[in-house]
Amino acid sequence: MITSPSASRNSDTDLVWESSSSSSRNNSSAVASKPFLHSVPPSDPLRQANRLPIKILKMLTARTGHILHPEYLQPLPSTPVSPIELDAKKSPLALLAQTCSQIGKPDPPPSSKLSSVTSNGSSEKESKSGPLKLSDIGVEDKSSFKPYSKPADKKDSSSGVSSGEKSGFRVPSATCQPFTPRTGSPNSSTSASPMPSDGKGERDEKKDSDCNKNCSSDGSAPTSVSHSRISVSCAGINVEVNQHQETTSGSKASATSDSVSCVTSSSSASVLGSGLVAPVSPYKPGQTVFPLPPAGMTYPGSLAGAYAGYPQHFLPHGGSLVNAQLASSLGCSKAGSSPLAGASPPSIMSASLCRDPYCLSYHCASHLAGAAGASCTHDSAAAAAASALKSGYPLMYPTHPLHGVHSSPPSFGGHPLYPYGFMLPNDPLPHVCNWVSANGPCDKRFSSSEELLNHLRTHTAFTGTEKLISGYPSSSSLASAAAAAMACHMHMPPSGAPGSPGTLALRSPHHALGLSSRYHPYSKSPLPTPGAPVPVPAATGPYYSPYALYGQRLTTASALGYQ
C-alpha cells in the first residue's frame, strides 16, 4: 500500500482503489467469455506477483520420454488388451511371479521363446497355442511346478506288461524311466519298474525252486543242473542272460562257474534285478578278485564256503567239492541270513577258534566235523562237505602236530597258500610232519605221536648251537633254549627229555606255572639264579607253559651280563 504524508491524500487514494477494484469485479464475467486479454498492463503489481520463474516453466513443459524404460515402450499387441491387464502383465511383480512359476519346467524351443516375448497373452494360451512346444510329461498345469507328481507314461508302461507277454518283447516306453529299487520278490528278476507278481514272476519262482531242488537234492550227486536269469531293462531295452549249466563230478569244473550258476538264482536276482549294473565285487560269486566266500554262502554247514571263490587251479578236485558246497549253501541256509553273510568266515570257522589266551595256533580244527554236524540241520549236506574236504584243501592256518591231522599228499611244492595240512580225524596216518625248511614242507606221515616226535628230533638238532654258546655259562640249558626258540614258531617239541626246559609243547590244559611266570619288566624277577634250569612241576607232565620261554630268555640275558 502506498503511503502519503497527508491524510487527505491517503483517503483519496483509498477511494480510487476501491472504485477500480469494484469496476474490475463487474467486468470479470465479460472478460471470461471473450478471448483472454489482459486488461491490466504487465507492469501491474498483481501480475508481477503471480509470475513463475522460467526454470520451473521449462521443467514442467519438458518431455518425459527419457525417464521411461524402453521395455515399457513396446508397441501395443494386435489383440485388444485392456490397459489394466497390460499393466498387470508388465509390472515387475508380475514378471517375477512369471519367472518363479517357470522354474523346473523343460526349456522351450527358441520359437516359443520368441512367441512368448512378442505376445503378451496369458501363459495358459501360450502353452496351448505355442508352436513346437515340448510335450508335457504328465504335468497338466504349466503354471505350477509339481516335482512329486508321477508322469503318465509310467502308468502306461507299468501296466502294459500282461501276464502272457515275455519281457523280451516289451514295447519300449517313450521316456526312460528312473531306476527305482525293487520292492517285489527277489526271485522275479524282471524290469526296473516294480510290477505285480503275475504269471511271469511265478515262472521265475518255479525256475528258481527247480534250481534249488536240483542243486540241494544230494550232495554227492553226479550231475547238478542249474539256471540263472539276469534281466536289466531301461526304456524298453531289455538285456537278459540265461545260463544253463551241467557239471559232472568226474570232470574238473571250476568252482567259480558252478557257484555262479546256482547261487545267482537266489542272490543275483536281488542284486542285479534292480536294473543297476553291479560292479566287480569280491563278495560276488564267480568274480574271483579276492579269495573270499561268495555272497550266496550262508553260515551253517558251508565248509566249502571259504574255497568257493577260488580259481580252478587252486582246487585239485572240483566236482565233489562244488556239489557239496552247493548243497550246503542252498540246503542249510537260514531264513534270516543276510546276503553279506559270506563276507565273514562261516560259523564252523568262528565257533571252533580257540579263545584261550595261551593258544598260539589254530589247534581246534579237529572239532570241525562235530561243529558242522551241530550247526547244520541237514546232516547229509554236512557229511558231503566233509567228505569233499577229505580230498585235501590247504588252509591258511598252521596246525598243531599232536592233534589228529589230515593233510594232502605232498604235491603242493609251489602252492601259493599256506602249505600246512587241513585236519580231519579218523585217518590211518593222522600225524604229519609240518616242518618247513628251505626245500619246502616235510609232509611225512606217521601213525603215532611217538614216531612223529622221534622224526621231529632230526629237524630240531641244530648243529651249530653248541658251538655258538659253548663259551658261556650254563651251556646245556642255553642250547636247549636256543633249540626251543628255533622250533617255537611251529610249536614242535625240540630235543630233550620230557620234563626238561627244552620240551616246549603248545600248552598244558592245566599248567601249574600260569601267569606267575610271565615276564614283568618293572618287577623283580622271581626266576631262579642263572645257570640253573627252570624247574618244571611233575604235574605238568610232558607239557610246558609257553610263557616259561620268557624266563629262559631272561636267564640267557642275565647270564650274558645284560641285566
Swiss-Prot record:
Give the start-end ranges of region Disordered: 1-48, 101-226
Q: Where in the cell is it found?
A: Nucleus
Q: Note the InterPro entries from the entry.
A: Elbow/Noc_ZnFinger, Tscrpt_rep_NocA-like, Znf_C2H2_type
Entry keyword set: Developmental protein, Metal-binding, Nucleus, Repressor, Transcription, Transcription regulation, Zinc, Zinc-finger
One Pfam family it belongs to: nlz1
Comp. bias regions, Polar residues: 1-10, 174-194, 212-226
Q: Does the keyword NAD apply?
A: no
Keyword Phosphoprotein attributed: no
A GO BP term here is:
embryonic camera-type eye morphogenesis
GO annotations of cellular component type: nucleus
In Gene Ontology terms, what is one molecular function of this protein?
zinc ion binding
Q: Where is the composition biased (Low complexity)?
A: 19-33, 112-122
Domain of life the protein comes from: Eukaryota
Point to the regions of Basic and acidic residues compositional bias: 199-211
Zinc finger motifs (C2H2-type), residue ranges:
431-459
- Cystine pairings recorded for this chain: none
Function recorded in the entry: Required for segmental gene expression during hindbrain development. May function as a transcriptional repressor.
Q: How does it assemble?
A: Interacts with nlz1.
Which family does the record assign? Belongs to the Elbow/Noc family.
> What is the protein name stated in its UniProt record?
Zinc finger protein 503
Taxonomic path: Eukaryota, Metazoa, Chordata, Craniata, Vertebrata
Q: What gene is this protein translated from?
A: znf503
